């Protein structure tokens, strides 16, 4: 990319900081992921700056310019946070780092250094180890631009050293694969292949990771990386790398009551690799079907997690059967998968609302397909059952849940032979839209979902009857024979009261 074009893409607040540091006699560069994204033609999420100015010198410069800085906690690591144009920018002094076995992520010692080359040498991957100055010159000492051109994620230096230093880098490698769609390469002897040759997720050579180092990582950091991976455009590719290298089978840790507790990541997924499915319906084994479904879905965390977990019950001894034609089948696997999903999300410390939603998506993901052959009455019964028993407190939550479930269903179906049948996929989409519309129009759950308010009902019934009255109206609307409209609801209630009292109540 043209040097002038790179600089032109920098936001003004970033240029102001670079120019101010340069004018004061210091080196200053945009560094890391922002440079990578600019070279790829992507919009960076943020713009980190590195400089040979020490934190106190950066602070003095900010004070002279009346620039706001955030609290100075970051100075312990040579970092000053400058807030300009309402946006925070990390300005970090060139530094070196030393790691030891005492911590799986944080360096044992840091020090300031005077060289950009030394600062870039401590970074994780070549595509993240580049710097850009205000004139548009890219400083690339480790072949980052070449790896970008070849779509490669490669550690800076020797992979074994990089991962022994900071175990989180192994998860970051998988995350960048998921976000960028690049292949991962490293030094050393090639490992064995993994997956089905000819599929999008086949790995010709699995890299060797010191995965046992993950045990010292905090659950919070691991979950953050895993979520970023799941939301990547190529999440399936990143997950395949995690499983093939053994990362998914590892544990991290969480501190509870003063002691560390081991938390498994996702070892339950291992048995899906190579697990055969009925070729009448399926293209791939269960794991690669899962990956394709994930990549076929919208990048929303609840959807992605539901698809990761939706087939975990397949192949288990209490689920799998072999049919008379010799083909495998997994009847009821969705219930087993939902049970496993609940345990997994709980141990990964997800909140109750999120967990219940994902578990519901997993449990319900097989319900849509039979509905293609049924009528409106069956759809309504299903909706009413889930309105009463699902993880929803309001109609809006129910509608949102069915929108998510539609996407889970379509992604799951689209990872089978059905993906080749455009008419069937269109019918599936239409069914989802029909169910969502029905939920929006006639499936209130709470009193607040009705078009009448409690104060209006108090003019018609005693206060101790309000709850039952709301329940009556909700039931009528859900049954489909009463629209959720203000006048219609009051008319229906008046009619009911007239039958009960032998007279008709008129509001005054």
Show where each model-derived region lies:
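Catalytic cores of the polymerase beta-like nucleotidyltransferase superfamily
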Residues: 1-508
């Amino acid at each position: 990319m043209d040097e002038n074009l790179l600089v032109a893409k920098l936001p003004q607040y970033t240029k102001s900081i670079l120019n101010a540091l340069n004018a004061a006699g210091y080196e200053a560069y945009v560094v890391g992921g922002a440079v990578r994204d600019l070279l790829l033609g992507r919009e960076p999420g943020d713009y980190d700056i590195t400089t040979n100015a020490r934190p106190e010198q950066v602070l003095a410069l900010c004070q002279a310019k009346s620039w706001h800085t955030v609290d100075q906690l970051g100075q312990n690591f040579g970092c000053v946070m400058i807030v300009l144009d309402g946006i925070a920018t990390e300005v970090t002094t060139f530094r070196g780092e030393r790691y030891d076995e005492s911590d799986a992520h944080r360096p044992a010692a840091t020090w300031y250094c005077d060289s950009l080359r030394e600062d870039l040498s401590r970074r994780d991957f070549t595509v993240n180890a580049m710097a850009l100055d205000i004139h548009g010159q890219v400083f690339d000492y480790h072949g980052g631009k070449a790896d970008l051109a070849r779509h490669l994620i490669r550690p800076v230096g020797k992979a074994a050293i990089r991962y022994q230093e900071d175990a989180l880098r192994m998860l970051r490698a998988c995350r960048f694969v998921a976000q960028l769609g690049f292949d991962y390469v490293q030094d050393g002897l090639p490992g064995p292949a993994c997956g089905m040759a000819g599929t999008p997720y086949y790995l010709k050579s699995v890299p060797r990771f010191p995965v046992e180092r993950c045990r010292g990582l905090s659950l919070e950091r691991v979950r953050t990386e895993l979520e970023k991976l799941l939301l990547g455009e190529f999440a399936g590719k990143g997950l395949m790398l995690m499983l093939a290298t053994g990362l998914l089978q590892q544990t991290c840790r969480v501190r509870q009551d003063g002691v560390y507790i081991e938390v498994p990541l996702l070892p339950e997924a291992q048995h899906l690799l190579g697990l055969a499915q009925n070729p009448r319906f399926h293209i791939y084994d269960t794991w690669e079907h899962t990956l394709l479904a994930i990549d076929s879905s919208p990048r929303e965390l609840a959807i992605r997690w539901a698809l990761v977990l939706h087939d975990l019950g397949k192949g288990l001894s209490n689920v799998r059967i072999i049919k008379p034609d010799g083909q495998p089948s997994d009847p009821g696997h969705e219930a087993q998968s939902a049970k496993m999903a609940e345990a997994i999300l709980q141990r990964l410390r997800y909140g109750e609302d999120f967990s219940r939603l994902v578990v519901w998506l997993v449990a319900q993901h097989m319900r849509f397909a039979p509905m293609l052959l049924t009528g409106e009455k069956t759809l309504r019964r299903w909706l009413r059952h889930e309105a009463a028993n699902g993880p929803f407190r309001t109609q809006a939550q129910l509608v949102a849940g069915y929108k998510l479930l539609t996407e889970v269903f379509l992604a799951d179906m689209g990872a089978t032979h059905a993906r080749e049948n455009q008419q069937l996929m269109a019918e599936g989409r239409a069914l989802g839209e029909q169910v969502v519309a029905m939920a929006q129009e006639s499936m209130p759950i709470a009193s607040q979902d009705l078009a009448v308010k409690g104060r209006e009902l108090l003019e018609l019934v005693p206060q101790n009857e309000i709850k039952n009255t709301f329940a009556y109206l909700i039931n009528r609307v859900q049954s489909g024979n009463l629209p959720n409209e203000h006048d219609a609801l009051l008319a229906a209630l008046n009619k009911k009261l007239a039958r009960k009292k032998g007279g008709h109540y008129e509001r005054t």
